[in-house]
Swiss-Prot record:
The gene is epd. The active site is at C159. Belongs to the glyceraldehyde-3-phosphate dehydrogenase family. Epd subfamily. Homotetramer. GO terms for cellular component: cytoplasm. The record marks H186 as: Activates thiol group during catalysis. GO terms for biological process: pyridoxal phosphate biosynthetic process; pyridoxine biosynthetic process. This is D-erythrose-4-phosphate dehydrogenase. Catalyzes the NAD-dependent conversion of D-erythrose 4-phosphate to 4-phosphoerythronate. NAD(+) binds at R11, I12, N322. It catalyses: D-erythrose 4-phosphate + NAD(+) + H2O = 4-phospho-D-erythronate + NADH + 2 H(+). Transmembrane segments: none annotated. It holds the Pfam family Gp_dh_C.
Length: 339
């Protein structure tokens, strides 16, 4: 049994714990503690009632001994709540923590990870892109087989790298990619304003519900980290749109082989049934973004939107639940790190 602690109980931290209870991994992973600076009452309430993913299927309570406890079925699973701002003072050693899932979105450097190690954790997995000095960056389904036992401080990439990189790999393996561009159409996030208010990014001073808002992205750097051969070959832009969840990615690539639409789509279908099973899905149904809410795949390719120009320029539409799909990959990578 892998003993896990979650640091940061926001959108991803809560989704990871919920995903564990909806998965077949509860006999492999035990969450023993959550570190979060907010109050236990708010933590329990937000875990029980979620505007995006609905009510948690079991009753959630909190008490003094175990300020957070979840009660599934007839047994009681108890998870310790901590409120420690200093990572090096967390009681990971006494709790015998094997792996910390750092879901704060704040920490991501090797030195941050070392603080968890100093506190007694054996390994750390960041839920966001980390520095180049980390032991590894994993996009599960693409390079998780590169994990080594000595890799202690690892990044799980981002929701968008987990969405687009498996698709890039499938197309590149089949036809060879020369270069590409990506537009990320991302749902609003909590670093945006409800109404116009001050922010260091002037575009993000504007109300999230009123505009499509361009934001900076380093997605191309994430692609280069996994595929060094694509250095200076990809560029990306990103916009936030007034929805609460689910992201669409507009991928355009130039390929070395002359292809037709069916060639591209069949490649994705084949990958979804074999090498990328449970990672990439495929659909041609006339769906919209909300239909992908709570989808556990990293990516869902909408084959009805695939286009090919002049045999070599390929455009694809790829969906993902940027919370739920990524949370499920955190669990997959956690287990891969335990081997």
């Amino acid at each position: 049994m892998l003993r896990v602690a979650i640091n940061g109980f926001g959108r991803i931290g809560r989704s990871v714990l919920r995903a564990l209870y909806e998965s077949d991994k509860r006999d492999k992973i035990e969450v023993v503690a959550v570190n979060e600076l907010s109050q236990p009452e708010a933590m329990a309430h937000l875990f029980q009632y979620d505007s995006t993913h609905g009510r948690f299927q079991h009753k959630v309570t909190h008490d003094q001994e175990y300020p957070y406890s979840d009660v599934p079925d007839s047994s009681q699973d108890k998870v310790r709540i901590l409120h420690q701002a200093d990572l090096s003072l967390l009681p990971w050693q006494s709790l015998e923590v094997d792996l910390v899932l750092d879901c704060t979105g704040v920490y991501g450097s090797k030195s941050d990870g070392e603080k968890h190690i100093t506190a007694g954790a054996k390994k750390v997995l960041f839920s966001h892109p980390g520095g180049s000095d980390l032991d590894n960056t994993i996009i599960y389904g693409v390079n998780h087989d590169t994990l080594l036992p000595e890799h202690r401080i690892v990044s799980n990439g981002s929701c968008t790298t987990n969405c687009i990189i498996p698709v890039i790999k499938a197309i590149d393996d089949a036809f060879g990619i020369d270069s590409g561009t990506i537009t990320t159409i991302h749902s609003s996030m909590n670093d945006q304003q409800v109404i116009d208010a001050y922010h260091s990014d002037l575009r993000r001073t504007r109300a999230a519900s009123q505009s499509i808002i361009p934001v900076d992205t380093k997605l191309h750097k994430g692609i280069e980290r996994i595929f060094p051969k694509f250095s200076n070959k990809f560029e990306a832009i990103s916009v936030r749109v007034p929805t609460v969840n689910v992201t669409a990615m507009d991928l355009s690539v130039t390929i070395n082989t002359n292809v037709k639409v069916n060639d591209i789509n069949q490649t994705i279908v084949n990958a979804s049934r074999c090498t990328l099973h449970n990672i990439v899905d495929y659909t041609e149904a006339p769906l919209v973004s909300i239909d992908f809410n709570h989808d556990p795949h990293s990516a869902i390719v909408d084959g009805s939107q695939t286009r090919v120009s002049n045999g070599h320029l390929v455009k694809m539409l790829v969906w993902c639940d940027n919370e739920w799909g990524f949370a499920n990959r955190m669990l997959d990578t956690a287990l891969a790190m335990s081997k």
